[in-house]
Amino acid sequence: MLRESDGEMSLGTTNSPISSGTESCSSFSRLSFDAPPSTIPEEESFLSLKPHRSSDFAYAEIRRRKKQGLTFRDFRLMRRIGAGDIGTVYLCRLAGDEEESRSSYFAMKVVDKEALALKKKMHRAEMEKTILKMLDHPFLPTLYAEFEASHFSCIVMEYCSGGDLHSLRHRQPHRRFSLSSARFYAAEVLVALEYLHMLGIIYRDLKPENILVRSDGHIMLSDFDLSLCSDSIAAVESSSSSPENQQLRSPRRFTRLARLFQRVLRSKKVQTLEPTRLFVAEPVTARSGSFVGTHEYVAPEVASGGSHGNAVDWWAFGVFLYEMIYGKTPFVAPTNDVILRNIVKRQLSFPTDSPATMFELHARNLISGLLNKDPTKRLGSRRGAAEVKVHPFFKGLNFALIRTLTPPEIPSSVVKKPMKSATFSGRSSNKPAAFDYF
């Protein structure tokens, strides 16, 4: 069953068709070169140094070329590799890199601004670009470059050769991951969500199709056009049992540039001055009334038409873990309206075809906490990843060293040859750092 998503939802929503990997890019190339390419002003397009990309050859190449100002003509499109609700993604490489064995491959997302303006979705493309500029994390994309070409807006990011977790799951026995594999991928997604929430970003579109697999087997979340970027900052919660200390402090408003500094400063104060308090990287005051997401993954508060906040990501995380382990989502049904009704009214249940091991019982307990229909009681809604990480399902897993673990599967590094009319390729070969705190 195809999952309908990637947009502000209605029961008639459908995904844009994805063409075969060998589709020619020549028509787009012609359109782009009919008008002189415009570039983003230097102060806006300058790529600030990203510490997590310090050993990334592809990132270094982009930064070297960036000094002269990048345009569409600096890239060679190879083939179309995906399409979504707001854009089309092409595999590409830097023009002039004739030795393919030494070339870095990239993914270029191309947005037709005129088409989006007609559909009144241009704000989604702008939101994604804004968020990408904020990110510097091993499990999240880095914005390598951005530029305009005629009425197209282009962003260049890392190319993930391993596809996505949805496709990878379908290649597993019985189309589901082992518990240990599911735990590995869930842990990396959890760390990525923690970082996003620390920045005040509610993802709102977590699903296996949006979790890409890098060439080293580790994951990368993608597609941020449905995300909510709030001014809410992380809260401080007391570990004391007194009612007044268990209240979350109401965060003040800060500019986006000052937000991260305030979090770091506050976390240091928590550690040094108030040892009984816990730093919570969770935008607990962020709210939205938008009806967005993927039907099988939306939380009950969204399905019922109410407002929502950070808790929707923890619901989606529970649905994701359920699907990874059992091969289907917990409230799946033949039609979208029945799916939404199930999400609101039907009780969570688990397969009973075989006895559950203790490891699986831990997984079920975690999923049950995440899929609490009351967002105020949902696991993660108040203290975020901090309370999810300590669940017995993740016992023995060192989150700070997760990138040193060998992933369940490491994809082939082979990139298919482009067609004659194609252009571009790029892929990073960065080695992971020893550890990460976010």
Curated annotation (Swiss-Prot):
Cellular component GO terms, alphabetical: apical plasma membrane; cell periphery; cell surface; cytosol; plasma membrane
Effect of E128K: In pid-5 and pid-11; strong pid phenotype
Activity regulation statement: Activated by magnesium and PDK1. Inhibited by staurosporine. Repressed by calcium.
Active site: residue positions: D205
Conditions for induction: By auxin.
Binding site for ATP: I81, G82, A83, G84, D85, I86, G87, T88, V89, K109
Protein name per the record: Protein kinase PINOID
Species the sequence originates in: Arabidopsis thaliana
